[in-house]
From Swiss-Prot:
Region of interest called Interaction with UBL1, as start-end residue ranges on this chain: 846-856
PTM annotation: Autophosphorylated. Autophosphorylation is not required for catalytic activity. May be sumoylated.
Active site (UniProt): D322 (proton acceptor)
Enzyme kind, highest EC tier: transferase
UniProt similarity note: Belongs to the protein kinase superfamily. CMGC Ser/Thr protein kinase family. HIPK subfamily.
Name of the featured protein: Homeodomain-interacting protein kinase 3
Record-listed cross-link Glycyl lysine isopeptide (Lys-Gly) (interchain with G-Cter in SUMO2), residues: K27
Function: Seems to negatively regulate apoptosis by promoting FADD phosphorylation. Enhances androgen receptor-mediated transcription. May act as a transcriptional corepressor for NK homeodomain transcription factors.
Main location: nucleus
Length: 1191
């Protein structure tokens, strides 16, 4: 039974002294079970509801905040789940991963006794989770002085941690108890050969020893140290654990989802194991949710990750032997929901060294072969995993036996008696079964309760919450009542597959039990059965959640010495670099950083065919042409200075495009070098998806039907398997003429996904309001800057948070200013934006330079204001969030943002949760305070974007009030140097279109777009009207100002067109199906496969000296000197000049504008590409570009 801990004023304490320490006893009064009555069946996960929720605005499940309204010294009660410390084997309750500063250390030392049991030990409403009786009433009880009840990362609102009791150290503070436990003192220093660790908090205790939270001195790193007992009975197992951890340390812990062990050392004859700090175990998570059932879409990623860990252990011949919810840790439930790792290898052993009748596993999760004394292997871990996922589904253990007899009795009643061949061999079978002798044939039967009690003297108890006659009955438990239509059908199919897998995992015969590899291929994990419901929002949510557990593995593999190709290097001319493959649902864009003296090329998208709507091309890759220094490859001396690589796509797509002739490139392109010591490489940015059936000409965002998997989009090609042959010289039809020592500079595209993911390693700015659907990979090459602090400086400063900085809301912010600023620009207005719900403890103050000279004082409607319409795109789930793309200018940086999510003022709407959830009224965003969507929170300064152009107040309305457009794109040439050519586009969207406001000239026309709702119905209607675009206008599409939020970097410069250039109408090329015109790129949602669209610039007149020529991406946070560059051109043999094609992702949005005189281009404005300064239009599928069967 649980207890309440009551803290009394100091005069109530009775101090007792001994030879070892002075202790103030704490009065403990028992009370009823805290969780005796189940609350309404709802699960809070990061402000989201699962199951059958009721309207609530309370805190989320991951917040264990306990409001303390009374001052210190007054009586208060604590929930049991807050400070339970389990005294079980492997009960490593690691609760926080927040760096502790030296200034906040408590001044007083505290001694933890070896019998520190809070709240009557590990009990679940009267049910002990272990068979061992715990001595909970003997010994002095002590709680850490200044010990915060909450995890350090979740204490943002806790002003005063609770001082419970104090203790002063005695003369023998570091002695070892009779049971072998080490006597810890707070702020004691544990020393290894290389590092010193300061003890901060006590985390947990078990039969192995204890776990403490420590600070690694000299760094910001917080670790968990497991201090083993020095008792002789634990010495052998301690050595086994150390050897197993040493073996696992050679593997990628992030890829295989087990805890990372750093080092092992001896401290006062106690073995100390140093691990990474993790957040919370699954048992505590269930307890915080009052043991409410979890939905299958949450159980699935946990199962997948643990099965991946077991697969690796099986391949190494290792048995974990203690898998249970306490040993499955949530890495970071706030920023990486559903990301779990397996911990505690204290009971692990090699399969060749197993001994029958060994007491292994926690009882609730103990396999029948262990109970019966049969030989066992890795299959016992699969049984335990089956019990774990059943517990997550039921909210209660499937077989909660208080005794082993109860355990096998529960199993036999639900699944039938073990086979006779098993009972005959089992060394402990006669403890629970007896042979029948009065029958014609001998058989086994389970002993009755009376027989077992008479033999053992122990009375059996009924502890089950659900009593099943068959495992098939589980499908009817906790049915979801708020689903209908295809969502309900998908849920029923999911339940059937779940029960099918559970039955295979819980087979009594271990030889027939499913293996980890088979589990990963089961339809419940692969979700093949859900492909029958392509339009279900519930299914989409399942795929997005599964992406959480798939993304980190592929990315972290690259960042943990698995691919030296992507490891950062540092040189004199190039800063340390990193490569990031960012998962964006249907596209993985590679982000690279480099110094100012290098040009970064995101990629040259090469399209395989001309099919664009609803069909995937057979072979389609994006290559990155760049010197090895940019890729992080050190120069290999003594080897050839250049080579080519052929990249094969392993997963071809079905295509309807007619075969076209391959493009040619001059052989000298790949053989030239940028310098004498570097090499050129072609590196794929992403690989394609599994085969899908083409859906011809459907402009819909839900064209993910067929057999494709959302989670398979953007998978990275392993370098070791695909760089296996040499690529022939012919690559492009556009002949590229290069000066030998200079890098190629081509048009590139920014792909911006609205949800950046964050980890403890890189501290990306997190979009907390939608962290459930984080699908990004947690390792970033460079951090997407938030709103830039537009200071009038003529230098470049880069302020980055350290990778291992532990502040939760810290984000790297890059402050960039122009090398030379015009005086008129330097006088522009600045306004301060305070992000109200910033996850950072301090208020984020961001200053932005406006783009106007006139100081407007009258308020004008906020461009970011959300009207709360049902069609508001910013208020929808990320399943419908548009991806944003713009052609990079020299001052552009890759920015990640989420409309209505990472914005300072998220729209408070009942349906702002995932698509499959009903309106529940829960608007808690990870504990962040609510804020309104007001004008002062707008990421843009409240001043006009266009100089000398009257502003229309009606343009500030939210685009969501109208029909949502299918896509939004903007093509932007690089920065020009002539201020006379400036055109600042003011984005407005009152009728689903955006008209550019050209200085001194009205926008001639609009571009009609269909509503997104119509697109979702898959009506095969034409999205755009074909029209001629003249040179004196620039068309932009957008969903309104609500799409712009605080995560954008510098507002990029819009495409500007000199009005002096004569108009030259342009019609689209006829080379693709359904070429019903589009202005800049294709209709995003119709472009289902995410294949890059080829956007060559049309033939035009000669290039002027100040014309924009190529889209050059400059690395953020670096200086931008004027570089002298020899000229080059990208030309077609026939004389028609084209820009190198640019890859665009579906559902794209334009980037914010920036005044073009604020920043200077990287290169001088002389003509170095044969392109026109005026961009008239872009063909969807140029006839000059072809398919590449070798890609």
């Amino acid at each position: 039974m649980a207890s309440q801990v009551l803290v009394y004023p100091p005069y109530v304490y009775q101090t007792q002294s001994s030879a070892f320490c002075s202790v103030k006893k704490l009065k403990v009064e028992p009370s009823g079970c805290v969780f005796q009555e189940r609350a309404c069946p709802q699960i809070h996960v990061n402000g989201r509801h699962f199951g059958n929720p009721l309207p609530s605005t309370k805190g989320s499940a991951f917040q264990t905040k306990i409001p303390f309204s009374k001052p210190r010294g007054h009586s208060f009660s604590l929930q049991a789940g807050a400070i339970v410390v389990k005294d079980t084997a492997g009960a490593t309750k690691v609760i926080a991963a927040q760096a502790q500063q030296a200034g906040v250390e408590a001044p007083r030392a505290v001694v933890w006794r070896n019998r520190l049991h809070f709240l009557g030990g590990p009990q679940r409403c009267g049910l002990k989770r272990k068979s061992e009786e715990l001595d909970n009433h003997s010994g002095a009880m002590q709680i850490v002085d200044e010990l915060s009840i909450l995890p350090a990362m979740l204490q943002t609102n806790m002003g005063n941690p609770v001082t419970v009791v104090t203790a002063t150290t005695g003369s023998k503070q570091n002695c070892t108890s009779g049971e072998g436990d080490y006597q810890l003192v707070q702020h004691e220093v544990l020393c290894s050969v290389k590092n010193t660790y300061e003890v901060l908090d006590f985390l947990g205790r078990g039969t192995f020893g204890q776990v403490v939270k420590c600070w690694k001195r000299g760094t910001n790193e917080i670790v968990a140290i497991k201090i083993l007992k020095n008792h002789p009975s634990y010495a052998r197992q301690g050595q086994i654990e150390v050897s197993i951890l040493a073996r696992l340390s050679t593997e990628n812990a992030d890829e295989y989802n087990f805890v990372r062990a750093y080092e092992c050392f001896q401290h006062r004859n106690h073995t100390c194991l140093v691990f990474e700090m993790l957040e919370q175990n699954l048992y505590d998570f269930l307890k915080q949710n009052k043991f409410s059932p979890l939905p299958l879409k949450v159980i699935r990623p946990v199962l997948q990750q643990v099965a991946t860990a077991l697969k690796k252990l099986k391949s190494l011949g290792l048995i974990h032997a203690d898998l249970k919810p306490e040993n499955i840790m949530l890495v970071d439930p706030v920023r990486q929901p559903y990301r779990v790792k397996v911990i505690d290898f204290g009971s692990a052993s090699h399969v060749s060294k197993t001994v029958c009748s060994t007491y292994l596993q926690s009882r609730y999760y103990r396999a029948p072969e262990i109970i019966l004394g049969l030989p066992f292997c890795e299959a016992i871990d699969m049984w335990s995993l089956g019990c774990v996922i059943a517990e997550l589904f039921l909210g209660w253990p499937l077989y909660p036996g208080a005794l082993e007899y109860d355990q096998i009795r529960y199993i036999s009643q639900t699944q039938g008696l073990p086979g006779e061949q098993l009972l005959n061999v089992g060394t402990k079978s006669t403890r629970f079964f007896c042979r029948e002798t009065d029958m014609s044939h001998s058989g086994w039967r389970l002993k009755t309760l009376e027989e077992h009690e008479a033999e053992t003297g122990m009375k059996s108890k009924e502890a089950r919450k659900y009593i099943f006659n068959s495992l098939d009955d589980i499908v009817h438990v906790n049915t979801v009542m708020d689903l209908e239509g295809s969502d309900l059908l998908a849920e029923k199919a999911d339940r059937r597959e779940f029960v099918s897998l559970l039955k295979k995992m819980l087979l009594i015969d271990a030889d027939l039990r499913i293996t980890p590899i088979e589990t990963l291929n089961h339809p419940f994990v692969s979700m093949k059965h859900l492909l029958d419901f392509p339009h279900s929002s519930h299914v989409k949510s399942c795929f997005h959640i599964m992406d959480i557990c798939k993304s980190p593995s592929s990315c972290e593999t690259n960042n943990h010495s698995k691919m030296s190709l992507l490891r950062p290097v540092a040189s004199n001319g190039t800063a340390a670099l990193a490569a990031n493959f960012t998962k964006v649902g249907t596209l993985r864009s590679q982000a690279l950083t480099t110094s100012a003296h290098s040009v970064v090329h995101h990629g040259i998208p090469l399209q395989a065919g001309t099919a664009q709507f609803g069909c995937g091309d057979a072979f389609h890759q994006t290559l990155i042409i760049c010197p090895p220094a940019i890729q992080g490859i050190p120069a290999a001396h003594g080897k050839p200075t250049s080579y080519s690589i052929r990249v094969d796509n392993t997963v071809p797509l079905v295509t309807q495009a007619p075969a076209v002739q391959p493009l040619q490139i001059r052989p000298g392109v790949l053989s030239q070098t940028w310098s004498g010591r570097t090499q050129q490489m072609l590196i794929p940015a992403w690989q394609q998806v599994t085969p899908m059936a083409p859906a011809a000409a459907t402009l819909t965002s839900e064209g993910m039907a067929g057999s494709q998997r959302l989670g398979d989009w953007g998978k990275m090609i392993p370098h070791s398997n695909h760089y296996n042959s040499v690529m022939p010289p012919p690559l492009l039809t556009n002949q590229i003429t290069l000066s030998a020592p200079q890098p190629i500079s081509v048009g590139i595209a920014h792909v911006v996904w609205p949800q950046p993911a964050t980890t403890k390693k890189n501290k990306l700015c997190q979009n907390r309001s939608n962290s459930l659907q984080n699908t990004n990979v947690p390792h970033s090459a460079f951090i997407s800057p938030k709103i830039i602090s537009g200071k009038e400086v003529e230098e470049v400063s880069c302020v980055e948070t350290q990778d291992n900085h532990t502040s939760e809301g810290e984000a790297r912010t890059c402050h960039e200013a122009s090398v030379r600023q015009d005086s008129s620009v330097s006088d522009k207005q600045r306004q301060t934006i305070i992000i109200a719900d910033s996850p950072s403890p301090a208020v984020s103050v961001i200053t932005i330079s406006s783009d106007t000279d006139d100081e407007e004082t009258s308020p004008r409607p906020s461009l970011r204001e959300c009207k709360g319409s049902l069609d508001c795109e910013a208020c929808q789930s990320t399943l419908n969030i548009d991806r944003m793309c713009s052609l990079s200018s020299p001052d552009s940086t890759l920015s990640t943002s989420s409309s209505g999510q990472s914005s300072p003022s998220p729209c408070k709407r009942p349906n702002s949760m995932s698509d499959d959830e009903q309106e529940s009224g829960c608007e808690t965003v990870d504990g962040s305070p609510t804020s309104d969507s007001s004008g002062h929170d707008s990421p843009f300064a409240e001043s006009s974007f266009v100089e000398d152009t009257p502003q229309n107040p009606e343009l500030g309305t939210c685009a969501g009030t109208e029909a949502k457009p299918a896509l939004s794109t903007a093509v932007e040439p690089p920065v020009g140097t002539e201020r006379g050519l400036n055109v600042d586009a003011h984005m407005a969207n009152t009728d689903s279109t955006c008209q550019p406001l050209t200085k001194g000239q009205p926008a001639p026309g609009k571009l009609n777009q269909p509503s997104a709702s119509a697109a979702r119905q898959q009506k095969p209607t034409s999205a755009f009207q074909q029209q001629h675009l003249n040179l004196s206008q620039v068309q932009h599409f957008g969903t309104g100002h609500q799409e712009w939020n605080g995560n954008f970097g510098h507002r990029r410069q819009q495409a500007y067109i000199p009005t002096s250039v004569t108009s030259n109408p342009f019609t689209l090329s006829h080379g693709s199906p359904n070429h019903t015109a589009v202005h800049a790129h294709l209709a995003g949602s119709a472009h289902l496969g995410g294949q890059p669209t080829l956007l060559p610039y049309p033939p035009s007149t000669a290039l002027s000296s100040a014309a924009p020529v190529a889209h050059l991406l400059a690395s953020p946070c670096t200086s931008r000197p004027m570089l002298q560059h020899p000229t080059y051109n990208i030309s077609h043999p026939s004389g028609i000049v084209h820009q190198v094609p640019v890859g665009i992702n579906p559902r794209l949005l334009p980037s914010p504008t920036i005044h073009q005189t604020q920043y200077k281009p990287i290169f001088p404005p002389h003509s170095y590409i044969a392109a026109s300064p005026a961009y008239t239009g872009f063909p969807l599928s140029p006839t000059k570009l072809s398919q590449y069967p070798y890609m």
